[in-house]
Amino acid sequence: MEIPKEFLDRMRAILQEEGEWQSFLHSFSEMAKRGIRVNRKKVEEAEKEGFSFREWKEKWHLEPVFSEEREEEQREFYVEEEELRESGISIGKDPYHEGGLYYIQDPSAMAVVPRMEIRPFDRCLDLCASPGGKSLQIADLLSEEEGGILLSNEYVGERARILSQNAERMGYCNLAVVNETPASLAENFPSYFSRILVDAPCSGEGMFRKSEEAVKDWSPLLVEKCAERQRDILESAFRMLREGGELCYSTCTF
C-alpha cells in the first residue's frame, strides 16, 4: 500500500509527541480490530428457546469493549475474526447474524453513542445513518412506552436501502428510515430533536488499511470538499435541534 505523500506530510506535522509518528506508521501494517454488538432483546427471546448467551460468548472468546460495564449490560464485544474463520465460522454469514442476534461494527464506532447520554424519551435524529450501527445503538436506548423515537436519515438511495434492511433484520420498530437531504429535513423539523447525531461523511483516511480504493481516491481537494460538505450538514442539523438539546458530531477523518 502506497500512502499519499501529502497525507503523510500532514500527519507528520500533527504527530509531534515522542513515538507518535512511528506508532502511526506501524498501525497501517496491523490488522484492524473487529467487533460485534449484541442485540440483547433477540438474545433474551432466544434464551427462552434454550439458547445460552454465556456459552456462545465463551465459544467465540468475546471480550467486552467497555470492560467497566456490568456483565448483564454488556453489548459491545471484540471478536477474533481470523480465529473464528479457522474454526469454519464466518461472522458475516453466521445464522446468528442473519437472525439479528448481533451487528458487525468497528469497536471505535461503538464509542460515539454512549457520549450522547440518550434518555428513553428522547426525540433523536441520526442524520447520516447508513449502514446503521449507531442508529441501532440509539434505538436500543429508547423506550416506545415513554415516547422515544428515532429518525434515521441517509441521503444516498442505495445506502438507505441497506439501512432499512439492517433495522428490519435487527428487529427495531421505534425508528423510521428516510432518504432526504439535511436541508430538506431542516425545513420540516425546525427545533424538533433533543438529540442529534451527525456522523459526517469524510475523506476516508480511516479506511486506508481496508480499501485500496480509499487510498486511490484521497487527495487534498477531497479533504476540502468533505470539510465544506460537513459544515453544510452541521448547519442544517443545528436548525433541527430544540432548545436544551445536544448535537454530537463525529467523523473518522476530516
Q: Model regions: which residues?
A:
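S-adenosylmethionine
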Residues: M1-F254
